[in-house]
Every structure is written in C-alpha cells, then in structure tokens.
Amino acid sequence: MWRLTGILGRALPRLLGPGFRGITPKPTSSDGPQTTSTTLPLPRVNFDRSGSHGSKRNRDPKCCGWKEAFHWMSAHVSPNTLRDAVSWGTLAVLALHLARQIHFHAPLVAGPQSAERCSWHSPLYRFLSSSWWHPHSSLRRHVLPSPDCPAPRNTGLREPRLGQEEPAARSQGLPSDSSLKPGLLNLPEEEPSDFGFLNASRDFTSQAKAAEAGPPGGKNEQDKPKALPLEEAVTSIQQLFQLSVAIAFNFLGTENIKTGDYTAAFSYFQKAADRGYSKAQYNVGLCLEHGRGTPRDLSKAVLFYHLAAVQGHSLAQYRYARCLLQSPGSMSDPERQRAVSLLKQAADSGLTEAQAFLGVLFTKEPHLDEQKAVKYFWLAASNGDSQSRFHLGICYEKGLGVQRNLGEAVKCYQKSAAMGNEPAQERLRTLFNVEAAGPSHLAIGLKSFSSPSLCSLNTFLAGASGLPHASSTGNLGLLCRSGHLGTSHGAPSRAMPSLERSLVRLGFG
C-alpha cells in the first residue's frame, strides 16, 4: 500500500477528466463572491477569496480547504469515477510487479544463455533508467531496487556460468549510450568460490554418472546375479531358519550336559552340526574325543574339529592342530606345516591355549625356535596362563631366546606361584634352599634381586595356594605321552577343567 501513494498522485488527476482539474470548491457563504482558479490542481485549494467567511472563523484555512474540497468532490464526482481511478491504479501497480517478477524469473526457465539476455540491462530497465526520468521519480523508485540493495541472485537455482563467458556477456548487455552509465546499478559480482564449488560438484556428478555407466558389457555382467531376487530372498530366509534351528539344538545339548544326560546332548549336538553350525561341530568333536554320550573315536573327533576349523572356529583350529601334531610320525611335512599354521591363526586371535601350546612346540625339534617360544610364552602369560609364566621364568634362568637374567626369572616364578602353579612354587623353594646352604654364583644373583626370607616366602605361598589359577598345556613331551592337556611333572593333582564346564562355556562362544 505504500506504493499506491505515488501512483495515485499521478493516475488520479488524469483519470478524473479535464473538467475536474483546476476547479476550486464553491464557497458556502452567501455574501461572498465565488472565485475560481485554473492554475492549481487538486488537492490544493485556493484560500485567497473575498468574503467574510474566512475572516470570521478561527479555523485553520488549510484544514477547512481540504474539508470543503472533500465535500465538493463527494457532491460533484460520481463514486464510479473514484472506483475506476483506484481500480486502474491498482491494476497498474500489479502489472508492474508482475513484469518485475517475470523479469527476475526469466533466467531460471531459459537457461544460461537466456539468463544473459534477460539480465538487469533489459528494455524495461533501460526505459526506466533513461535520463529523462528523474532520479527520485516515484515510479522508478518503486519498480527498480535501490542502488544500496544488491540485485537478487538465485545462486542456488541458476545454472553456473563459466568464467570465460561472463565478461563477454556483460559487455554485450551494457548499453552503448554514455548517458545511461550514471543510472546503471552496480551489480555485485558473484564470488568465484561459488562457481568453483558448483563446477566441481557438477564435474564430480558427471564423473560419477560416467563411472556408473561404464562399459555396456560390464554392466550386463553385474546385472546377471540380480536376475532372480525372489529366489535369493527365499534362500536367505531358509539359511536363517536353519541357523536358528541349529542354535536351538546346540542350546538344548548344553542344557542336557548340565543335567548329565550325555546321550541326549550328543544327539542334539549332532543335529545342529548336520546343519553346519560350527559351535555344534566343535561340541560333537569334544564328545567323540572324550567318549561322552557316544563311544570314543578320535578320528571322527578330528573330522568334526576340521569342519569347525574351516569355518574359523579358533578352539576347533587349536584342537585339530593339536590332534595332528600328537599323531604318530607318519604325518607329512605339508600336514605338519598346516597344523602349525592353524595354531598361529588361533594364537593370533587371542586364544591362550594356542599361544601356550606354540610356546612349548617351538622349544622342540623339528620346530625349534627359541625366540618364537619366548614370544608365545609371553603372550600366554600376559593372558593369565600360570604355566606359561613358569616356562618364561625357565627361559630367563637358562638364557633360552633371551639374555640370562636371574632376577626376571625369580619374578616370573613368583607371579606363577602366586597364581597357584606348583612347579613354580617348588622351583622357588629350591632356589632359596641353595641360597641358605651357602654362597654361590646363583645365591649372589638372588641377593642382588633382594628376595624375601624363607619364612616370609612360606607365608606368601600358603596364602597364594587358594588363588584361582588357569589351566596350561604343560610339557609337550608329557602331553604326547599322557594324552591329557594341562598336566605337568611335579603337579599330578592339577587337571584340565571338566568337559561339562568346557561345553557350557564354549557352546556359545
């Protein structure tokens, strides 16, 4: 509405007709003569008229004149004329706004080339910015934006233009008449970073489309496996169903192991293993190896261990490799290397049993490697295996794979003894008995370590006997002769955890 004032000031006098212009309202006083003025248009009224009407009243002549003019206009001008004037003025304003909107949105529809032609230097702009229009003209001020306000830019919607095309387009769009230069708007140039970003995005999009298109032959090859999505979905559902059933059977087997029904447990493990479940295959191998719920058959146990090991089950890899290495000497070198490779995979996955077994294995021929033995002893000891800590102490005492260090050896023995390892406790007693018997080279080394006295050592060992301890592999030679894992010379009372505990603990992991 604020733009209507300037438009109506010029449209209203022209639309009311020539007879209305220059006429002043008729005075209401009866004794004053009527005067006319043909020089002043509405809404200004001539107040220099004779008569006693103007001198007798103490009113503002300007306010009185406007009021009389309004009454005269209401009396002599029909309402239709005023309505037409307002309507035509409103239509003119709407037409100018519509032209301006069309002028702004034309580049969006026409594209980059049309955007150059439909720029701010259009015929409408050149017409309104010509020299014969006053700079403060109401029509020009209301239609064209002010120089302080930047020209509207739709950078997010317009096509980006190349930097080489901009100067030429701008030079063509500028008018040649020098008189138009003072009235032209200073259009802010678009930042080159915006163009660089949009061009980079467009290039990236085009490269991505080109990469997706690719050679026609490769695209057809990629589409071939996706020809039967329904069959693939059905197969996936069947596999999920089989896996769910296998998990349920394996769970039932572990529950029957807890209750002591080994026959039913082995039956459930067998059903789950037939569906390819690696944990159930490992449990079947345990039952066959120890003869729980089925006659003992080591060859079948090795077969099921192998099936689970192929699927990446670390415990199955360890037991399968251990069974191969414990077999008679008829095993070929490729099979032996394969067993060692499986042990390394299980040890690298963090399995403590495999790390301890490899440490013992690398102390024997034909796999003798003292440095690797120390490495795997240290890994297993870091994971809490007391027997590997004891073996690491032997390496420090004898200088196997490491520099001989009696102080570190005693540290390892003490840590292993604190975890309840009986061979480590016996070794510590032997060392301190030698120290108490008389000075020797060994005693000098022990004194430098500042070891505790025998009384305090006995008290310490008595308190440590009740601590929890981890099972270990023991000596490899004893393991091959006895066939049981976790026993060692000097510790006959220590045994491997029961099968029931192994199944419950390992049935899901």
Curated annotation (Swiss-Prot):
Residues 1-23 form a transit peptide. One of its GO terms (molecular function) is protein serine/threonine kinase activator activity. Keywords: Apoptosis, Cytoplasm, DNA damage, Membrane, Mitochondrion, Mitochondrion inner membrane, Mitochondrion outer membrane, Repeat, TPR repeat, Transit peptide, Ubl conjugation. The record marks 142-143 as: Cleavage. Residues 46-60, 156-168 have a biased composition (Basic and acidic residues). TPR repeats lie at residues 213-245, 246-278, 279-313, 314-351, 352-385, 386-423, 470-498. GO terms for cellular component: cytosol; mitochondrial inner membrane; mitochondrial outer membrane; mitochondrion. The keyword DNA damage applies. One of its GO terms (biological process) is integrated stress response signaling. Residues 19-60, 143-185 are annotated as: Disordered. Disulfide bonds: none annotated. Interacts with DAP3. Protein kinase activator that acts as a key activator of the integrated stress response (ISR) following various stresses, such as iron deficiency, mitochondrial stress or mitochondrial DNA breaks. Detects impaired protein import and processing in mitochondria, activating the ISR. May also required for the induction of death receptor-mediated apoptosis through the regulation of caspase activation. This is DAP3-binding cell death enhancer 1. The gene is Dele1.
